[in-house]
Every structure is written in C-alpha cells, then in structure tokens.
Amino acid sequence: MITVNVDLGERAYPIHIGAGLIGRTELFAPHITGSSVTIVTNTTVDPLYGDALRAALAPLGKRVSTVVLPDGEAYKNWETLNLIFDGLLTERADRKTTLVALGGGVIGDMTGFAAACYMRGVPFIQVPTTLLSQVDSSVGGKTGINHPLGKNMIGAFYQPQAVIADIGALTTLPDRELAAGVAEVIKTGAIADAEFFDWIEANVDALNRREPAALAHAVKRSCEIKASVVAADEREGGLRAILNFGHTFGHAIEAGLGYGEWLHGEAVGCGMVMAADLSVRLGLLDEASRQRLDAVIAAAHLPVRGPALGDARYMELMRVDKKAEAGAIKFILLKRFGDTLITQAPDEAVFATLAQTTR
C-alpha cells in the first residue's frame, strides 16, 4: 500500500492506494467516530463491492445503512441528491454520522455535497472505484451536482476524512470507463510533469491492459500532483484552475450532448485535443507537442474529434463555464508539457479550432 497525504493543516487527510483496500477495517476505523455510517453507492457498484465494504465496517460495531442510487451522469442532479437526504433522515443520521462514497466520480461528488449540506456538515470518506475518480475527482474536496445549463455549477468545497483507492476495483471497469480515467492521467502529466507525460506515452498500452504496476504508478503520481496543487490553492483561486485543462471544451461537449452521452473523461480527452489546437494557433505550443498529445489520447482509445454542436452552441456553453468572468471565456492552454497559461482567446481562433477538431 502507498499513502499520499493532502496537506491542508487541520483538515489534512491520507490517500491510501493499493489492491484489496476496500476490505481493510483498519483503514476506515480512525475516520469513523460516531455511532452510524451511511454508505452511498449505485446499482452497478453495490453488487460488486458493497458486501466487502459492509464486512469491513462490521467489526467497528456501528449501525450501517446503505443508499443505492441509479448509475450514471444523467442522475447527478437535485432529485438524486434528495434520495441521499431521504436515507439519512430515515435512519435518523446525526452530526457524527459518517458517509462513505463507494463508486465513481458521480457518487463521490454527490456524497460529498450531501455531507457538506446535511446538518451543515458531516464527515465523509471517499472509496473511489473508477480510475477517473481515483486519480482526480475523489481528491481535493470539489463536490456538487449538474444543472441543465452547466456542469458542476451547484456544489461546495468540502474535504473528505480519507480517500481509500482500491486499484483492485479497476479490474471490473468497462473499457470506456478505464479510458476515461486514463484521460485524466494524461491531463495531469501534460499540465504539471513533463517526465510523467513521457512515462504515460511509454506505458499507455500497459494502462490499457490494466497492468497493476502501471495503474498503481499512474494513481500514485496523479494523486501526488493533485495533492500538491490542492494544498497550494484549495479553492481554485489561481493555480488549481490548471487542473481544468481540456475541461472548458469538454464540459461544453457534455452539456451540449446531454449528460451521460459521453463520459466525462471522454469529453476531457477530446477537450485536450481542442485546447492543444488552440494553443498552437495562439503561438503558445509547438506543433510537435500537439501531435504527441493527440497521439497518446488516441492510443488511450479516447475520441479526438468533438461533436458538431455548432460554433454558437459551443460558445454559449463555454460562457457558463465556472472559469468564465463577465461572460468572457477563459481557457487553460499549454505552453509546453508541464507549463500552462490561463487566458482568453479571440473568437476567430476558437472558431478555427472548432472547424479543425469537430465533425
């Protein structure tokens, strides 16, 4: 087992990474101080890992309940969030009840938001079961739900007590979900660590094959990088925004097609292709680096051309992105691997990128 720490002073917490961790009682025990636990999971994950988690919690002598939600990005909304509150109130959960998010990014985001809101804040633990959630969404305290007009527009910054990333859970991931997680790994290397990006290029096939050593290193290094960024800028006042490379175009794709049509990581992968194209057009990135990024995204079996939503629709959706200010779109662009720039771009350059990178 590897442990990476997120250094946030009194709110610091560990990220435990390894195989078989869902069943290890001792990893949960220090973070559950109340008399009850509510597991939040979904219809896909509960049959796979719910019993193992409940068995791990049983020796603690707590009252354990489970809320099972429908699976998918399409359910990341108010109605589904209320199902969590229904379960907590039915079980008479109190301020010391610990929520445990067992699932991917949707479950983690909604459970964290519910924890932030219920009785104005109760503790929660992240148990991410997808590659994307292990390398990205479970770390850093971003929680929330979608709105029809924009992704993740309603939420809170609320840190977990711990993240328990069991890479054994990645063996049951569908291929599309695995590729979606590799997209966030690629993003992390591209924005923050050129040496890690080189490693990803050399090992993308090993990740596709789910080789345990490759997956463990990808999760570890991605978490180390994200932990350092979050420690420096917890609430995205500046530096943390670089983690949104590919997300401005990507969120527009997700909202434009309808949430769940493309997986989040698929949209981010394509969004990176689009952002790299724009980076070249603005004279920030060299063409050879753009081609390297495109090639590794394609090698991860991710889409490299966006849907034809139309220029006006893309611009409309990107203007409601969380990074936008006074309607001005801000892009995270690459200067070189490991070096980014947050900037606006002329509409003409954006239109040229859309013409080149969409169907």
Swiss-Prot record:
Pfam family, one: DHQ_synthase
EC number: 4.2.3.4
InterPro entries per UniProt: Dehydroquinate_synthase, DHQ_synth_AroB, DHQ_synth_fam, DHQS/DOIS_N, DHQS_C
The protein's required cofactors: Co(2+); Zn(2+); NAD(+)
GO BP of this protein: amino acid biosynthetic process; aromatic amino acid family biosynthetic process; chorismate biosynthetic process
Localization of this protein: Cytoplasm
Molecular function via GO: 3-dehydroquinate synthase activity; metal ion binding; nucleotide binding
Its job: Catalyzes the conversion of 3-deoxy-D-arabino-heptulosonate 7-phosphate (DAHP) to dehydroquinate (DHQ).
This protein's name: 3-dehydroquinate synthase
Gene assigned in the entry: aroB
